[in-house]
Amino acid sequence: PDQIAILRNHSRLLKTRAKDFLMLGRMLHPLKLDEPTLAIAAPLDKHSKGKGEVPTPAILTSSWQSSDGRIGHLFVNISETKQPLNVRLDTRNTPARGTYDVELYESKDRSSFQPLWQGVPLPKEFARELAPMEVVFLELREAR
């Protein structure tokens, strides 16, 4: 994977309020994705000079809770091709609260967070095609 592109996309993300989750928040159990895997070359062990292939999901994910209780889900397409993302969003292992407003950050747009849904109950299906090296972050907060 193009590591510079991935780092650049993460750096942009950390300039948004996603830092409340990724730097100051608490990691939650990640969402389960049913996505293709890649074979990534990696050292077999610390003493070996040989490399083996490690099966790795094409889309990496992590889930977070900010100090004020918002939930965030991060998705990163580490492949060099477009990948479909199909996921059932929930609040992970935190207590569910009525309905949620959901905002979306996409690195390919270099934008700030944009409203996605308002006042939706969870769990809810989310589907999107991720461009190569794209970073997507979803923020879930209790509906106002």
Predicted feature descriptions by range:
Residues 1-100:
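Active-site-proximal substrate-binding groove within the catalytic cores of carbohydrate-active enzymes
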